[in-house]
Design a protein with these regions (language model features):
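Conserved glycine-rich cofactor-binding loop
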Residues: 8, 15-17
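The beta1-alpha1 cofactor-binding region of Rossmann-like NAD(H)/NADP(H)-dependent oxidoreductases
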Residues: 40, 59-70, 228-229
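Conserved mid-core segment of classical short-chain dehydrogenase/reductases
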Residues: 90-110, 152-155, 264-269
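Catalytic Tyr-X3-Lys loop
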Residues: 101-121, 139, 156, 163-164
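C-terminal substrate-recognition "lid" of short-chain dehydrogenase/reductases
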Residues: 121, 130, 223-252, 258
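Alpha-helical segment proximal to the catalytic Tyr-Lys
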Residues: 129, 171-176
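Residue(s) in the substrate-gating loop at a strand-loop-helix junction
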Residues: 143
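Short, small/polar-rich loop/turn modules that mediate ligand/substrate recognition or access, typified
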Residues: 175-179, 245-247
C-alpha cells in the first residue's frame, strides 16, 4: 500500500525533469495521474511507459481553456481530483534587468509570467471546484529563488517570489476545504527550458556551462539534486493521513542553501 493509494492527481509540466519524476513517484505510491504538457511526443512516451495509470492532456498552462480541459479530462477518466500539482515553468538564463532591451521587456515579462505565475493560478482556478468536493490539496513547485537572490535573473526570481504569496493567499482563501503547499527545490539536474529570445546563449538549465559544479559548491551538502530526490515531499504533502493539518507551508529541498553562512569555509567529508 502506497501513501497515495487510490488518489487522483493532475500534474502540469509533467513530461520531464521534476514533473515526470513526480508523475512516476505518484504512480508508484498508488495514485492515478493526469499529466498536462505541451510536447505530444513526450506525453506519448510517458503514456507508453506508465500505461493506464495515467492519462495525458496536451495543452498550455497559460491558457484558461487548456487548464479547464485538463481538469475535465481528469474527472472524466478517474471520477474525481484529490491533488493539483502546478509545476510548469521556464527559466531566464540569469538575465539581469539591465541586459533586457527596453523594447523586449514587456514581451519577455508576459511570456515568463504567463507560465510561471499565471499558469499556476489558472490551474488552481480550474481545479478548485473538484478539490473542494474531495477536500484535496494543491502543491506548487517553487525554487530556492523564491527566497534568495542570484538563483536566476530578474524575471525568474521575481516570479518565484510571487508564488510564495500565491500559496499563502490561496491557503487562506480555500481553507478549510483545500490545503495549499509548495516545494522549493534547489539546483537540480533538469532540462528546464530558458525563455526563447531573452538571451542568445539560452539553453536548458542542465546544459549551462559550469552549472552543476558551481551550484554544488554553493551549498553545504555539496551536490545538486536529481529530480527524483524531491518527489517524496510531493507525496507527503498530497497525503491526507500524513499532512492533513499542513497548509501554507513550503518545504525547502535545496541542499541547505539557507545555512551557507557568510564566510568562505568549505564543507569537507570527515
Amino acid at each position: 500500500m502506497g501513501w497515495l493509494n487510490n488518489q487522483i492527481a493532475l500534474v502540469t509540466g509533467g513530461t520531464g525533469g521534476i514533473g515526470s519524476a513526480i508523475v512516476r513517484r505518484y504512480v508508484a505510491e498508488g495514485a492515478k495521474v493526469a499529466v498536462m504538457g505541451r510536447d505530444a511526443a513526450q506525453l506519448a512516451a510517458l503514456s507508453a511507459e506508465l500505461g493506464d495509470s495515467i492519462i495525458t492532456v496536451q495543452g498550455d498552462v497559460a491558457r484558461w481553456q487548456d487548464n479547464q480541459r485538463a481538469v475535465a479530462a481528469t474527472l472524466e477518466a478517474f471520477g474525481r481530483l484529490d491533488t493539483f500539482v502546478g509545476n510548469a515553468a521556464v527559466f531566464d538564463y540569469f538575465t539581469r534587468l539591465d541586459r533586457i532591451a527596453p523594447e523586449d521587456f514587456e514581451k519577455a515579462f508576459n511570456q515568463l509570467f504567463s507560465i510561471n505565475v499565471q499558469g499556476y493560478l489558472l490551474g488552481a482556478q480550474a481545479a478548485t471546484a473538484a478539490l473542494r468536493e474531495s477536500r484535496g490539496s494543491m502543491i506548487f513547485t517553487l525554487s530556492n529563488s523564491a527566497f534568495y537572490a542570484g538563483g536566476g535573473g530578474i524575471l525568474y526570481v521575481t516570479a518565484k517570489h510571487a508564488l510564495v504569496g500565491v500559496i499563502r493567499q490561496l491557503a487562506y482563501e480555500l481553507a478549510p476545504d483545500i490545503r495549499v503547499n509548495g516545494v522549493a527545490p534547489g539546483a537540480t539536474n533538469t532540462p528546464m527550458k530558458s525563455l526563447e529570445g531573452l538571451n542568445s546563449r539560452s539553453v536548458p538549465l542542465n546544459q549551462i556551462p559550469g552549472f552543476e559544479t558551481g551550484a554544488a559548491e554553493a551549498v553545504p551538502l555539496q551536490r545538486i539534486a536529481e529530480p527524483e530526490e524531491h518527489t517524496g515531499h510531493y507525496v507527503l504533502l498530497a497525503s491526507r493521513e500524513n499532512a492533513g493539518l499542513t497548509t501554507a507551508n513550503i518545504i525547502h529541498s535545496d541542499g541547505g542553501w539557507e545555512i551557507r553562512g557568510s564566510g568562505a569555509a568549505k564543507h569537507r567529508k570527515t
